[in-house]
Swiss-Prot record:
GO terms for biological process: mRNA processing; RNA splicing; tRNA processing. Keywords: Chloroplast, mRNA processing, Plastid, RNA-binding, tRNA processing. It is found in: Plastid, Chloroplast. Usually encoded in the trnK tRNA gene intron. Probably assists in splicing its own and other chloroplast group II introns. The gene is matK. PANTHER family: MATURASE K (PTHR34811:SF1). InterPro entries: Domain_X, Maturase_MatK, Maturase_MatK_N. It comes from Iris sanguinea (Japanese iris). This is Maturase K.
C-alpha cells in the first residue's frame, strides 16, 4: 500500500495557485455564460432559467457582494411553495436554483483552469501532436480488435456508484491545494443536499445535482473515474519490467479530449494502453498481457493466461478500490468469463471473439497430411434486443418489437415527422456502421420506418397503406439515400454493394464523440 501511495503522489502534479479569490470576479461568471470561452477546450454554453443578461449580471453582483460579507451565510428553508436561498444579513432572497447554478458554473470554471494549463504544458513538454481522431468513440474498437485477439479471459467490473460527494471533494483535494475553495465547495455540496432532502430521496440527490449542475458534476465525476483508472494503471505497471511511458500521455488525452466535448456525464471512456501508440514500441511483462477499457460505470478487463491469473487482476483491483475509497466492494459486481464463449456489451455493441477453423492439405513428396488451424475474429453486433427495449420505452414499438405510432408527435407536420424518424435512422446507421452483420440494424430501421408511417397516418386519420400510397417513394428516400451515398463513396468500386443485402463491411467513423441516444436508454 505504501507503493500505491507513492505512485499516486508521483502521478499527481499538485497545483499551488490560489483560485478562491477568482470566485469574486464577475468575468468568471461571464465566461461560464458563453462570453469569450468559445475557443476553450471546455466550452459548453449554459443558460439559467431564462433570465436575460442584465438580470443575470445583477444577481451575480448581488451574490458576490453577499459572499464578501463576513457574517454572511446561506441555508435552505423548507418553504411550502419554493425552495429558496435566504440571506439573513440582507433580508433578501433569490431562487436557490439560480444561485446554485451560478456558483456551480463558477466552480467549474475555476477547477478547470489548472487542468487546462497542465494539459497544454504537457503537450508542449512531450512535443505530442494533437490527434483529434482519438475523440471518436469508434477509435476504441480497432484497439480492442487488435488486442483481444490474443487474450483469453474478460472480466466485467461495475465501477462503484453512486459515490458520496465528500469523496469527490477529497479526490479533488489531492490535485488542488486551495483550502478555501475546497471548503466552499464542500459547503455548497452539503447545503445543496439539504435543500433537496425534503423533495427527493438520498439516492436521487446526486442524480438531481448532476442534472442541474452538469458542468461541475461532470468534472467531479471525471475526477473520481480518473482515480479508479490510476489504480488500474498502478496494477499494470507493477507487472511490467519496464516503465510504460504511454500511460501518462493517453490518460491526459482521455481527460481532456475524449470526455469533455458534448459527452454526457455517465458515458466516460478509458483505454489503458499497454504500448506506445505513436512509437510502436512493444513491451514485455512478467504477467500475461492485460488490457482494460471502461465506459459509464462499467469496466472491462481482458487478460491472457489462466483463469486464476485473471481472477487475480479483478481481486487486486477490488481490494485497491476498497482501500483507497473506503467502501465495501461487492464481489458479485465482478464476472469472469472466457472470451471465446462470451459476448460483452460495450458502447452499444455486443462484442465477442469467434473461432474460425480451417483445414489445409499439405503435400510433401509422396505424403500428404491435413493441418487444422484456428483463427480468432473480433465480431461486433448490433444489440437488437436492447435497442428494441429502448424503442419500446420511447413509444416507437411494443416490447415485442411491433411498430406503433408515436402519439406525442401527432401534432407535427408530415415533413417534420419524416425528418425526425429519418434522422434517427441515419444516426443509428452512422453509429452502428461497425457492425459485422447488418440484419439486426435493418430490423431496427424497419420498426422506425413503419412507426413513422403509422404516426403520420394517425395525424390524417387514415391507414398506413393510404398514407404510403400518397407519399410514394419519398419515405424510403428520406431514410436510406444519404447512407447509401456515403457508403458508396467509402467502399471501393470493385466491391459490389447492395444496400438491402447482408454486406459485412465494417466502417469506423472518426467523428463520433457521443453515444447514440437509443444506446443510452438501453
Amino acid at each position: 500500500m505504501e507503493x500505491l501511495q507513492g505512485y499516486l503522489e508521483k502521478g499527481r502534479s499538485r497545483q499551488q495557485p490560489l483560485l478562491y479569490p477568482l470566485l469574486f470576479q464577475e468575468y468568471i461568471y461571464a465566461l461560464a455564460h458563453d462570453r469569450g470561452l468559445k475557443g476553450s477546450l471546455f466550452y459548453e454554453p449554459t443558460e439559467v432559467f431564462g433570465y436575460d443578461s442584465x438580470s443575470r449580471l445583477a444577481l451575480v453582483k448581488r451574490l458576490i457582494i453577499x459572499i464578501y460579507q463576513q457574517n454572511f451565510f446561506l441555508f435552505g428553508v423548507n418553504d411550502s411553495n419554493k425552495n429558496r436561498f435566504v440571506s439573513h444579513h440582507h433580508n433578501n432572497f433569490c431562487y436557490s436554483h439560480f444561485y446554485s447554478q451560478v456558483i456551480s458554473q463558477g466552480f467549474a470554471i475555476l477547477v478547470e483552469i489548472p487542468f487546462s494549463l497542465r494539459l497544454x504544458s504537457y503537450f508542449e513538454k512531450k512535443e505530442i501532436p494533437x490527434s483529434h481522431n482519438l475523440r471518436s468513440i469508434h477509435s476504441i474498437f480497432p484497439f480492442l480488435e487488435d488486442k483481444l485477439l490474443h487474450l483469453n479471459y474478460v472480466s466485467d467490473i461495475l465501477i462503484p456508484h453512486p459515490i458520496h460527494m465528500e469523496i469527490l471533494v477529497q479526490i479533488l483535494q489531492c490535485w488542488i491545494q486551495d483550502v478555501p475553495l475546497l471548503h466552499f465547495l464542500r459547503f455548497f455540496l452539503h447545503k445543496y443536499h439539504n435543500w433537496n432532502s425534503f423533495l427527493i430521496t438520498p439516492k436521487k440527490s446526486i442524480y438531481v445535482f448532476s442534472k442541474e449542475n452538469k458542468r461541475l458534476f461532470r468534472f467531479l465525476y471525471n475526477s473520481y473515474v480518473s482515480e479508479c483508472e490510476f489504480l488500474l494503471v498502478f496494477l499494470r505497471k507493477q507487472s511490467s519490467y519496464l516503465r510504460l511511458t504511454s500511460f501518462g500521455f493517453f490518460l491526459e488525452r482521455r481527460h481532456f479530449y475524449v470526455k469533455i466535448e458534448r459527452l454526457r456525464m455517465q458515458h466516460l471512456i478509458l483505454i489503458v494502453v499497454c504500448r506506445d501508440f505513436f512509437q510502436g514500441t512493444l513491451w514485455s511483462f512478467k504477467d500475461p498481457f492485460m488490457x482494460x477499457x471502461x465506459x459509464x460505470x462499467x469496466x472491462v478487463l481482458a487478460s491472457x493466461g489462466t483463469h486464476l491469473l485473471x481472477k487475480k487482476w479483478x481481486y487486486n483491483x477490488x481490494n485497491l478500490w476498497q482501500y483507497y475509497f473506503h467502501f465495501w466492494y461487492q464481489s458479485y459486481r465482478i464476472h469472469m468469463n472466457q472470451l471465446s464463449x462470451y459476448s460483452f456489451y460495450f458502447l452499444g455493441y455486443l462484442s465477442s471473439l469467434l473461432k474460425n477453423s480451417s483445414t489445409v492439405r499439405n503435400q510433401m513428396l509422396e505424403n500428404s497430411f491435413l493441418i487444422d488451424t484456428v483463427t480468432n475474429k473480433f465480431e461486433t453486433l448490433v444489440p437488437v434486443i436492447f435497442l428494441i427495449g429502448s424503442l419500446s420505452k420511447a413509444q416507437f414499438c411494443t416490447v415485442s418489437g411491433h411498430p406503433i405510432s408515436k402519439p406525442i408527435w401527432a401534432d407535427l407536420s408530415d415533413s417534420e415527422i419524416i425528418e425526425r424518424f429519418g434522422r434517427m435512422c441515419r444516426n443509428l446507421s452512422h453509429y452502428h456502421s461497425g457492425s459485422s452483420k447488418k440484419q439486426g440494424l435493418y430490423r431496427i430501421k424497419y420498426i422506425l420506418r413503419l412507426s413513422c408511417a403509422r404516426t403520420s397516418a394517425x395525424t390524417h386519420x387514415s391507414t398506413v397503406r393510404t398514407f404510403x400510397r400518397r407519399l410514394g417513394s419519398g419515405l424510403l428516400e428520406e431514410f436510406f439515400t444519404e447512407e447509401e451515398q456515403v457508403l458508396s463513396l467509402i467502399l471501393p468500386k470493385t466491391i459490389p454493394f447492395t444496400f438491402y443485402g447482408s454486406h459485412k463491411e465494417r466502417i469506423w467513423y472518426l467523428d463520433i464523440i457521443r453515444i447514440n441516444d437509443l444506446v443510452n436508454h438501453s
